[in-house]
Design a protein with these regions (language model features):
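Metal-dependent catalytic cores of enzymes that make or break cyclic nucleotides
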Residues: 1-77
């Protein structure tokens, strides 16, 4: 987690490796937008709103912004 409350090391902010920060956002998006045995997939709009909502606490705010604006929205057009 970007805010340092993550397991196991409690790394915070830029101390978290860049690749890990990217995977955190991508994994969360995939988990929300894929069907699971215990629930149906959530909408892309909802997943984006959750990524934005938790930007700065769970997610690196810059990575979250780039993922939403450059990756997701660019692919919708």
């Amino acid at each position: 987690r970007w805010d340092g409350k993550g397991y196991p090391s409690g790394l915070k902010g830029n101390d978290i490796p860049l690749f890990s920060r990217i995977i955190c956002v991508v994994d969360a998006y995939e988990a929300m937008t894929a069907d699971r045995p215990y629930r149906s997939k959530l909408t892309q709009e909802y997943a984006i709103s959750e990524i934005i909502k938790y930007s700065g606490s769970q997610f690196d705010p810059e990575i979250a912004k780039i993922f939403v604006e450059k990756v997701l929205k660019a692919n919708w057009q």
